[in-house]
């Protein structure tokens, strides 16, 4: 018997997450590790669970994630985006709730590039009048 699974791809900053939802108990596995082990910050783990809170499907699906690129914050945002997209495959009626919460929109903010002659993207060396 083939197991039902739903997939979605999420992106944030330089992170890309490939998410699979399988009907289960709510266990989240990121890169073959438990989410508590992989992401040490509790607030970022809450970010990951936001789509389930909005759609009231907490504990209904096991989440298997492959994520690469970026840091903890970018990866958490990418996982959230991927879960939201996968939940659309579960039930297209979730679209309005997820859209209202802003979970389907790809966050387009990226790190601004460093400019020549400056120390960082916008930080210049101290100005001396004389």
Curated annotation (Swiss-Prot):
Organism name: Enterococcus faecalis (strain ATCC 700802 / V583)
GO CC entries: cytosolic small ribosomal subunit
NCBIfam families hit by this protein: PRK00132.1 (NF001099)
Family matches, as HAMAP family: Ribosomal_uS9_B
Gene name, Swiss-Prot/TrEMBL: rpsI
Alphabetical UniProt keywords: Ribonucleoprotein, Ribosomal protein
Biological process per Gene Ontology, one example term: translation
UniProt protein name: Small ribosomal subunit protein uS9
InterPro entries: Ribosomal_Su5_D2-typ_SF (IPR020568), Ribosomal_uS9 (IPR000754), Ribosomal_uS9_bac/plastid (IPR023035), Ribosomal_uS9_CS (IPR020574), Ribsml_uS5_D2-typ_fold_subgr (IPR014721)
Family, per entry: Belongs to the universal ribosomal protein uS9 family.
An MF annotation (GO) of this entry: RNA binding
Gene3D superfamilies in UniProt: 3.30.230.10
């Amino acid at each position: 018997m083939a197991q039902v699974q739903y997939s979605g791809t999420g992106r944030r900053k330089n992170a890309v997450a490939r998410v699979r939802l399988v009907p289960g108990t709510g266990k989240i596995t990121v890169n073959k590790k438990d989410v508590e082990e992989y992401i040490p910050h509790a607030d970022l783990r809450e970010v990951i669970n936001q789509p389930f809170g909005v759609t009231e499907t907490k504990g209904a699906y096991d989440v298997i994630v492959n994520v690469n690129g970026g840091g903890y914050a970018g990866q958490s945002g990418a996982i959230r985006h991927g879960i939201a997209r996968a939940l659309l495959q579960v039930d297209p009626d979730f679209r309005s709730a997820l859209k209202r919460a802003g979970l389907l929109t790809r966050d387009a903010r990226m790190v601004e590039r460093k400019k020549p002659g400056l120390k960082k993207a916008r930080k210049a060396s101290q100005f001396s009048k004389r």
